[in-house]
């Protein structure tokens, strides 16, 4: 009987599958037993060929050689992981293998990882698909009992390949055109560039904002009710005319208050929906300051290593109905401290609330919301970051077993000397889910109002006036930028409802799986920088937006592309038609860059020369500190000159910055505290209760000096040679 070759995305997942299936015999890059051979990729083992593969003229970056539009993009084996590719190829093509099971991540990119390997290895055997939302033993066993036909996912592969090819044609051509035209390390991409444009638009709105002073008026009665004045026609509470505000204050002081209406209604507030990836990234950024990338990395460990949560790269906040039968088992798995009391209360509620609030088949596509698995966990085995995220997921899950909270809202309108006064009160009737230790932030309940009826009269105790100023739009942080990428129409001035509809249907720009990487690329390309939690666009970022074609800056364009990729998944559009249009668009981008008369100017040039090529270095703010990088795109030299560490200032407890090189390195704080590195290390030895040791400082420095590894794509490989990051999604 022929054996089944199973292709996993990573060694850790392959080991889990092998253990569950009883594959104990070790081979070269595989595990075998019970009729299965489990092998694994290391992420992408195959990628698109570099431009020079299609002609020697493309080896050197020259504007006149653009655009590069190979008729067909060819696949090549990635050199660094070629050994594993050949091991996988050998397994897949063994004569005793009759069927291949794709067990890579259940999503578009996971499909691409596997299918590119199968294509490059010339595998022509029948394909089955393991499609599971968690990697617990139970999920793996159940998944292998109901393997899907691989043909069912061929359109998913077509969409993934179309996305990668579009990024090659548009990204590489646009990046080479900008870089060679302006002799600067510039890159553009169909997701990266519109995301940068969203930040730039907010920056411009803040710059143009002119604050306006205003007053609000409060009136307190002798029985303790506080009313607020409002314009009778517009209902606006702010008064922008100083003279009018003073006149109103005097007018209200000389009047009695007559109640015009008292309205009471019940407000039902359900628990917040379960987490999808974006919502969890936003919450983790807001609560703990984690970057989107940090959250995704910790989630991936919770999913793969701990088997604690379901598939993380999901865009759904609901469960499918077939998961209802697993809810009791999941409750049992989280019946440990600190959730035990909440679990006991949840069990008393039964499943009625959970079904009503969590289950919605229409809002689940490939993957359901993030929830705990059926496998019991120990928080002690998790890192601090992992435990915090796990707690958020579990508490949100448990909250949905409880009914909505109920409160009574009372709104009162009154007249005083012809002016409208309003008061609001809120009384909690039933706590529902709010009565549990969910960890959610409760809305502050308004003060209670005494009983009142229409026609009641009240005496004025005092009339107060408060002054304020209108505020500019807030700066983006990583959490709010993720939200803007998900719903960019809310941040556009465009009145075209068709564009807004397209953005809504496409689910924004980028995907839940790629948005964190896009933000990281904006940092590593020095287009944005962080001050505190706020994001600022750099001079380089602003100039880039002046140099790229206007259409590439529009969120609508990339959203339209995402829609078309989804149509390819659904079988409603052909990949070839989409790619033909991407080639034409790449041509147009190059033509516009060539014709543009604008210039790029380095305004961060230092007096220090590059030790490798002699040109002056540029000073930039990286995500974790200041760096100096060579302005020459072919040199790529860079060094850290100041980096934010985890060490704390002994005076104000803020994070210290490590500056300088060699023996002259100094720790400095914004409060003015400074100490040499040697003194810092000596102080650490004397105080063992602190967290940073000499070894940790040195380890941290080494990590900071390592350049980030680029994604396995031809575009990324090209940009890596320049010290740039590509937009591969």
Curated annotation (Swiss-Prot):
Annotated GO CC locations = cytoplasmic replication fork
**Alphabetically ordered keywords of this record:** DNA-binding, Isomerase, Magnesium, Metal-binding, Topoisomerase
- In the UniProt entry, which residues are flagged as the active site? 311
The segment annotated Interaction with DNA runs over 187-192
Q: Which EC numbers does the record give? A: 5.6.2.1
Q: Does the keyword Phosphoprotein apply?
A: no
Which reaction does this enzyme catalyse, per its entry?
ATP-independent breakage of single-stranded DNA, followed by passage and rejoining
Extract one GO BP annotation from the record.
DNA recombination
Name the PROSITE patterns on file.
Answer: TOPO_IA_1, TOPO_IA_2, TOPRIM
Q: Which residues bind Mg(2+)?
A: 9, 105
Q: Does the keyword Isomerase apply?
A: yes
Q: Where is the Topo IA-type catalytic domain?
A: 153-590
InterPro entries assigned to the protein according to its UniProt record, in alphabetical order: Topo_IA, Topo_IA_2, Topo_IA_AS, Topo_IA_cen, Topo_IA_cen_sub1, Topo_IA_cen_sub2, Topo_IA_cen_sub3, Topo_IA_core_domain
Q: What cofactor does this protein call for?
A: Mg(2+)
Matching SMART domains, A to Z?
A: TOP1Ac, TOP1Bc, TOPRIM
* Molecular-function annotations in GO: DNA binding; DNA topoisomerase type I (single strand cut, ATP-independent) activity; magnesium ion binding
Summarizing the function annotation, the protein's role is:
Releases the supercoiling and torsional tension of DNA, which is introduced during the DNA replication and transcription, by transiently cleaving and rejoining one strand of the DNA duplex. Introduces a single-strand break via transesterification at a target site in duplex DNA. The scissile phosphodiester is attacked by the catalytic tyrosine of the enzyme, resulting in the formation of a DNA-(5'-phosphotyrosyl)-enzyme intermediate and the expulsion of a 3'-OH DNA strand. The free DNA strand then undergoes passage around the unbroken strand, thus removing DNA supercoils.
Name of the molecule in the record: DNA topoisomerase 3
